[in-house]
Amino acid sequence: MADLKITLIKSAAHRLPKQRAIVKSLGLGRVSSSVVKPNNEATRGAIFHIAHLVSVEEVK
């Protein structure tokens, strides 16, 4: 499986505490920050909860 590049496109401020915790646990800090994570069920589950805040693209 390829990795996923996750980019924070909207701020996590004024969001539910669970959503803020997920953003922080993924290693995203400021808007436009990006991380590369493995494409597994745990990562996809986290992305599902904050899909409206992030942009996801597949990286080989």
UniProtKB/Swiss-Prot annotation:
Task: Please provide an example of a Pfam family that matches this protein in its UniProt record.
Answer: Ribosomal_L30
Q: Does the keyword Ribosomal protein apply?
A: yes
Here the disulfide bonds are none
Keyword field contains Ribosomal protein: yes
- Gene Ontology cellular-component annotations: cytosolic large ribosomal subunit
Annotated NCBIfam families: rpmD_bact
Task: State whether it acts alone or in a complex, and with which partners, per the record.
Answer: Part of the 50S ribosomal subunit.
The family annotation for this protein states:
Belongs to the universal ribosomal protein uL30 family.
Which named protein is this?
Large ribosomal subunit protein uL30
Report which gene this protein is encoded by. rpmD
